[in-house]
Amino acid sequence: MRHAVVLLSGGLDSAVTLALCKRDGFEPHALSFEYGQRHAIEIAAAQRVAASMHVQDHRIATIDLRVFGGSALTDEAIEVPRRHSERSGAESRNPVEAATRAATGSLDFARDDGIPVTYVPARNTIFLSYALAFAEVIGASDIFIGVNAVDYSGYPDCRPEFLAAFQQLAGLATKAGVQGKRMMIRAPLLALSKAEIVREGVKLGVDFALTHSCYAPAEDRAACGCCDSCQLRLAGFREAGVKDPIRYV
């Protein structure tokens, strides 16, 4: 059986990516990161997802991106943008209405350069580099990552150009590449809408109740329903005609 490394955050996209990896006949080796993100709930979600899909090898790498900051996800001084901080009343607390705004492209949680404050500088570059090292050690020639370039937050490291560049790097900077063995960076969700990802997950039997997407969950771990990630998730489920099974505030 072919072996593959799967980047697993515990979110909706990475869970579907893991399921696709298994469907395609790979033995998945999941890799998650405790990188100084605000909430350890992400790691717990990744562990639940991995267990539900009977992943035998799930590694959790600890790195600290808080040393750089620069993102609302790693720097407590930068607030995670939420719609209810810009609007008032019941409308601001309605995740379905917020999801509709997300689907129509009204997300405006960006810096002056257009990049959202929730972008973690070089995160996918770092994660893929770790995955590349892991793949070399276990003899895997495939790395799966759940990035999406259709319904996404505008992160520069979720674009096809970035993946193509990293694919080239993988061929130049590894023992396998020098030996003429191609290391493949696979992004099966890249051209799918969030609704299509949800439908694919349903078809593959993904238990979305185990996943976590929220950037700013409540103390009881309920999703806020108002951050960028929640809005994209809710819009995807709504458009797919599927009920989102997680709890919202």
Please state what every model-predicted region is.
Residues M1-L204:
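ATP-dependent adenylation/nucleotidyltransferase module used to activate substrates
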Residues G154, A222-A223, D228-V249:
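Iron-sulfur (Fe-S) cluster-binding segments and ferredoxin-like electron-carrier domains
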Residues G180, M184, E219, P245-Y248:
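Residue-level signal for alpha-helical context at structural boundaries
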Residues L204-G225:
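Immediate flanking context of iron-sulfur cluster ligation sites
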